[in-house]
């Protein structure tokens, strides 16, 4: 029989059954009752597994050492989880932690940071708790029924020509391609222009190697991307010119085209913005992905170029249907959309097929 008693602002629950005596403290009476009922059912069915008496902080440490280190996005996840380990939530025992604790954490974080940041941290926490279930420490993810913060509207900020010119000027990159880039600052300017021409992510640009560039076909192959899939990106005339300019500083010791890590690219770009007085202009390097390609390329083709798996994100955030003059572009592409089809016909999309809900359905193999 469970005993639930209020002690100050908290609720103390105790279960004694079949020789097992367990207790825990909760923020709400409802959470205390739920825990007690779940424990009693487990004891009655013989499925009871004792939850180890470790704190969330200790659990985070185990997860970082065994799981995070195996991920491609380990740096970002490590930063988020270490930040969580410094919150009051981290000191709570796994035997006691419940939805109310996570709700209190969520509400407090929303006072400190943006909903987007909270969503990312919540995602890392949820992955941590899911792994905890796999380790047989708990049987249910306490975040499962916790309401997510409402995501903000997609970013639509785009660079204007004046901002592009200012950033290139302060980088010292020679757009006339006479003087080769000599510093990381110069290379950052080149990477910025290359991003505008290709819609590639900063990490993809930083990891781009010479052996994956085909000058004859005017393409570059990305063996691994953010979503875990490879893709081939067509290169515009300007993108090819930038790459040809960078061949003058190509070295045998470093196969990377821009010779810097993603962190260096991010740091140097922030430095350029500060030098030019644009640090408060609400501009991110990632905003280059909605620049010229969004103006010139059909949304279906753009999805294949940019690597987006979700067409709704692409259309809401990046796509600008300003294509009245056709698809023969200054960038060097000749991309004519399939006649008779539109985004309204869209039904399903992945890296292999586009299926349209016409009658009869049309399947296009990519």
From Swiss-Prot:
Active-site residues from the entry: 201, 226, 308, 318
Domain Tyr recombinase: 168-331
Domain Core-binding (CB): 54-133
Alphabetized InterPro entries for the sequence: CB, DNA_brk_join_enz, Integrase-like_cat_sf, Integrase_catalytic, Integrase_recombinase_N, Tyrosine_recombinase_XerCD
Superkingdom, taxonomy of origin: Bacteria
Name of one Pfam family that matches: Phage_integrase
Keywords: DNA integration, DNA recombination, DNA-binding, Viral genome integration, Virus entry into host cell
Biological process annotations from GO: chromosome segregation; DNA recombination; establishment of integrated proviral latency; symbiont entry into host cell; viral genome integration into host DNA
Keyword Transferase annotated: no
GO function term, MF aspect, one: site-specific recombinase activity
Family that this chain belongs to: Belongs to the 'phage' integrase family.
This protein's name: Putative integrase/recombinase HI_1572
Source organism (scientific name): Haemophilus influenzae (strain ATCC 51907 / DSM 11121 / KW20 / Rd)
């Amino acid at each position: 029989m469970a005993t639930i008693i209020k002690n100050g602002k908290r609720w103390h629950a105790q279960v004694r059954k079949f020789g097992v005596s367990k207790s825990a403290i909760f923020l709400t009476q409802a959470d205390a009752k739920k825990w007690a009922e779940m424990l009693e059912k487990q004891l009655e069915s013989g499925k009871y597994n004792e939850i180890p008496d470790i704190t969330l902080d200790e659990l985070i440490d185990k997860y970082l050492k065994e799981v995070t280190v195996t991920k491609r996005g380990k740096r970002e996840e490590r930063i988020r989880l270490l930040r969580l380990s410094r919150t009051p939530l981290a000191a709570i025992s796994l035997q006691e932690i419940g939805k109310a604790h996570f709700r209190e954490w969520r509400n407090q974080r929303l006072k400190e940071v943006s909903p987007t940041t909270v969503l990312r941290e919540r995602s890392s926490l949820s992955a941590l708790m899911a792994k905890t279930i796999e380790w047989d420490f708990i049987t249910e993810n306490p975040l499962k029924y916790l309401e997510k913060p409402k995501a903000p509207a997609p970013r639509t900020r785009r660079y204007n020509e004046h901002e592009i010119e200012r950033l290139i000027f302060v980088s010292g990159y020679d757009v006339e391609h006479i003087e080769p880039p000599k510093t990381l600052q110069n290379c950052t300017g080149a990477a910025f222009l290359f991003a505008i021409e290709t819609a590639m992510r900063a990490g993809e640009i930083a990891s781009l190697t010479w052996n994956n560039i085909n000058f004859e076909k005017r393409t570059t192959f990305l063996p691994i991307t953010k979503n875990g899939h490879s893709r081939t990106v067509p290169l515009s005339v300007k993108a090819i010119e930038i790459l040809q300019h960078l061949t003058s500083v190509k070295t045998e010791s470093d196969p990377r085209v821009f010779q810097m890590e993603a962190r260096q690219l991010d740091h140097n770009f922030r430095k350029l913005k500060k030098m030019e007085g644009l640090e408060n202009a609400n501009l991110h390097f990632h905003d280059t992905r909605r620049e010229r390609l969004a103006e010139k390329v059909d949304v279906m083709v753009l999805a294949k170029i940019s690597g987006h798996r979700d067409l709704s994100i692409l259309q809401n955030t990046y796509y600008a249907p300003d294509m009245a003059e056709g698809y023969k572009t200054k960038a060097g592409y000749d991309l004519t959309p399939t006649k008779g089809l539109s985004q309204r016909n869209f039904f399903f999309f992945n890296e292999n097929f586009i299926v349209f809900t016409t009658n009869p359905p049309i399947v296009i193999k990519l």
